[in-house]
A protein has these predicted regions:
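Non-catalytic terminal and boundary segments that flank Rossmann-like NAD(P)-dependent oxidoreductase
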Residues: 1-88, 322-323
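C-terminal helical subdomain
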Residues: 65, 257, 264, 272, ...
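Conserved hydrophobic beta-strands of the Rossmann-like cofactor-binding core
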Residues: 88-91, 158-159
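N-terminal Rossmann NAD(P)H-binding glycine-rich loop of SDR-like oxidoreductase domains
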Residues: 95, 99-105
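Conserved glycine-rich Rossmann-like NAD(P)H-binding loop of the short-chain dehydrogenase/reductase
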Residues: 107-124
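Conserved Rossmann-fold cofactor-binding substructure of NAD(P)-dependent oxidoreductases
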Residues: 136-154
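Hydrophobic structural elements of the Rossmann-like NAD(P)H-binding subdomain
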Residues: 159, 213, 262-265, 275
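Catalytic loop of short-chain dehydrogenase/reductase
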Residues: 164-186, 191-195, 201-257
Length: 323
């Protein structure tokens, strides 16, 4: 386009308006970007927004310890598990770890337990749950459908707890990426809870008034990666938990119209076989026995109401975690 002609076009009212709109759009986009950056900084700072927990787990625990915060340091000081007495509660991944600890706590509180797993451990059998459903592979739709049909009656609470954690640290720069393991974690941790929930819903085992607890992890917070994973890595674990969180949020949005509540729960840092590779930081990050983690989860389920539907909660302190 000749220079003179271009100048003439820009000088017309329509062209000037278009140019102003474009400049305003660019400025608006930059303002939004700055606001998003500021929000990111707020959620990862030492003083997060009200109602949200702190990103730095070492500082979070040290602060709670110094202030002797009962919710964090002694769950029994605030714990009330009476709400599960007589309630039908299904737990996936019930044979070990936090799942087994949940079953122990639920049994102690008089819940009617429906325990699902691939293969029942002797410890689980000793609890004598009302129902043990074995052979449950959450990566199989057919297995989940079969499990749902085997559940004898509608449930009051579903705890989607089954998970998988590939222990070696993955780093692209080290050549240690394991893509098959990443897909396995995503299938079990993110798609698995959807298969279970879908099967139970369509079998009539999840109905109005039911609560669904999605046990995921703070590792699924995209916002917190700059603090908790400054060097990146551990792709499969974090991607699977972030995907699980998204699935749970979408479930919460859909099922609220059915009168069913869904909440995303980080159970806290628990001393289990799955976290054994982090044993050297258990103490400085406030890791607890699985029995304590189980109480934290049960306590939070008791606080679940429509007002808090779809929230991402840290069971250590009851505060929110940013997505």
């Amino acid at each position: 386009m000749p220079r003179a002609l271009g100048a003439t076009l820009v000088s017309t009212p329509l062209a000037r308006r278009a140019l102003r709109d474009r400049v305003a759009s660019v400025r608006g986009a930059r303002s939004i970007a700055r606001a998003m950056s500021d929000a990111q900084d707020a959620f990862t700072s030492d003083v997060p927004p009200e109602g949200y927990t702190r990103a730095d787990q070492v500082k979070r625990f040290a602060e709670a310890k110094a202030a002797n915060r009962a919710r964090v340091m002694d769950i029994d000081a605030v714990y009330d598990g009476s709400h599960v007495a007589g309630k039908r509660v299904l737990v996936t991944g019930a044979n070990r770890g936090i799942g087994l600890a949940l079953c122990r706590e639920l049994a102690a509180r008089g819940a009617v337990i429906v325990a699902t797993c691939r293969s029942a451990s002797e410890e689980l059998k000793a609890l004598k749950p009302a129902e043990i459903i074995e052979g449950v592979d959450v990566t199989s739709t057919a297995c989940c459908d079969k499990m749902a049909k085997a559940v004898s009656a509608p449930l009051d609470v579903v705890i989607n707890n089954a998970g998988y954690f590939y222990e070696p640290v993955e780093r692209l720069t080290d050549g240690t990426m394991e893509f098959d393991e990443e897909m396995k974690m995503i299938d079990i941790c993110a798609v698995g809870p959807l298969r279970v929930t879908n099967a139970l819903y369509h079998a009539g085992k999840i109905t109005k008034g039911a609560k669904i607890a999605m046990v995921t992890s703070q590792g699924g917070s995209v916002t917190w990666r700059t603090v908790q994973n400054p060097r990146g890595g551990d792709y499969g674990h974090h991607m699977s938990k972030a995907a699980a969180n998204m699935g749970a949020k979408l479930l919460a949005q859909e099922l609220k119209h059915e009168g069913i509540m869904v909440q995303v729960l980080h159970p806290g840092f628990n001393k289990t076989d799955m976290t054994a590779k982090y044993a050297k930081i258990w103490e400085i990050e406030g890791a607890v026995d699985a029995s304590v983690g189980a109480k934290r989860v049960v306590h939070e389920i008791g606080l679940m109401t429509p007002e808090y539907n779809g929230m991402f909660i840290n069971c250590e302190d009851g505060l929110q975690i940013p997505w």
